[in-house]
């Protein structure tokens, strides 16, 4: 893994900084583990925009990634590492001894030929998966389930990880990157190590077109709109909006708490720092 700054042969390449990983597979993905992906451009069945800033972008197939890691007690081996256009992390193609192949998130330090195992008790090596009850306190993990058997939901992006802080009865305490400490049942599974491609955040796309290739459309400021389109719109000449920053639907956007799931609030031991 290396960061490469391109030569300024054009204005669009002057500020490009990209990551290069020579270990990645250069061919097509495993055909049995891909699905056709349809893009809606952010529109619903009526053709109206329901998700702003979406549309265009390069066509891509969806890679079926195994977040549940429920193939238990069957050893596997990393066959190859691959690029995935649908996420910031790289993925690893695992070939199990029974012949089945699955994609998993590529952990930091994982390389071709490494053994991988998902079981109730496994060696503490990057890529191995086990319930939180068997992971030593202080370990760094990723792809953590929030409900047993549902599949990993926490720490799945490039370079992400959480730390197992303590275990009390049926619950473990995990410290997230945001500083939040959360209680999760010890039957939930997690993968050892942190997610690979940790230099993803240091890249620079260099031009607006590279963002459009990824299916992201421009963001228009509210103060540049008309009053019918945004609460900040209108006014004679350039104005500051005349009110505290809000979304197009009038909800405060800076510092306003929007979390409404009181049912799981008791699972949060310490809030993230604001």
From Swiss-Prot:
PROSITE patterns: RIBOSOMAL_L2. Residues 49-59, 256-274 have a biased composition (Basic residues). Residues 40-59, 223-274 are annotated as: Disordered. GO terms for cellular component: large ribosomal subunit. Keywords: Ribonucleoprotein, Ribosomal protein, RNA-binding, rRNA-binding. One of the primary rRNA binding proteins. Required for association of the 30S and 50S subunits to form the 70S ribosome, for tRNA binding and peptide bond formation. It has been suggested to have peptidyltransferase activity; this is somewhat controversial. Makes several contacts with the 16S rRNA in the 70S ribosome. Part of the 50S ribosomal subunit. Forms a bridge to the 30S subunit in the 70S ribosome. This is Large ribosomal subunit protein uL2. It comes from Acidithiobacillus ferrooxidans (strain ATCC 23270 / DSM 14882 / CIP 104768 / NCIMB 8455).
